[in-house]
Regions:
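Typically the conserved alpha-helix immediately C-terminal to a functionally engaged Cys/Sec
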Residues: 30-43
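N-terminal "domain-start" segment that seeds a small globular fold
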Residues: 1-12, 46
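Conserved acidic residues
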Residues: 51-53
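Structural micro-motif
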Residues: 56, 62-71
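Hydrophobic beta-strand anchors of alpha/beta hydrolase catalytic cores
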Residues: 20-21, 47, 70
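Non-catalytic, surface beta->alpha helical segment in thiol-disulfide oxidoreductase systems
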Residues: 71-106
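Short active-site neighborhood of thiol/selenol oxidoreductases, capturing the structured segment around
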Residues: 14-26
Length: 115
C-alpha cells in the first residue's frame, strides 16, 4: 500500500532519495487503474501519493492539472512526470531514463520514504 502524503509530510518525503508521487483522487477511475502498477513499482523505487481533493495546494505547487499524474522527485526537485494511464513497462523505462543508473540501484531496499 502506498503511503499517503499531506501538507505536513510531503516536503520531508521528497527531500532526499528518489520517490515517485502519485497525484490522485478517489473518484478518478484512471487513478485506480494505475494503482496496482504503482504498488508493483514500489520494489524498484519508493512510491507515495497525494489526494488532490484533500491537498490541492500541493498539486498546485507542481502544476498538476490532470490526474493521474505521477511525478518523480529527487533531492526535493521534480525530475519528471507521467500524466495518464501507462503500462508498467512505460514507467520502468521512464525511471531508467530519468534516474542515473547508480541511483536506481539499491532503492528497492529502502522501502517507503521517511517523513
Amino acid at each position: 500500500m502506498m503511503r499517503e502524503l499531506d501538507d505536513e509530510t510531503f516536503d520531508a518525503a521528497i527531500a532526499a532519495a528518489p520517490v515517485m508521487v502519485d497525484f490522485w483522487a478517489p473518484w478518478c477511475r484512471p487513478c485506480k487503474a494505475i494503482e496496482p502498477i504503482l504498488d508493483e513499482l514500489q520494489g524498484t523505487v519508493p512510491v507515495a501519493r497525494v489526494n488532490i481533493d484533500e491537498y490541492p495546494e500541493i498539486a498546485s505547487r507542481f502544476d498538476v492539472f490532470s490526474i493521474p499524474t505521477v511525478m518523480l522527485f529527487s533531492g526535493g526537485e521534480a525530475r519528471g512526470a507521467i500524466v495518464g494511464v501507462r503500462p508498467k513497462a512505460h514507467f520502468e523505462k521512464w525511471l531508467a531514463e530519468v534516474l542515473p543508473a547508480g541511483e536506481l540501484d539499491g532503492l528497492a531496499a529502502q522501502g517507503q520514504p521517511d517523513a
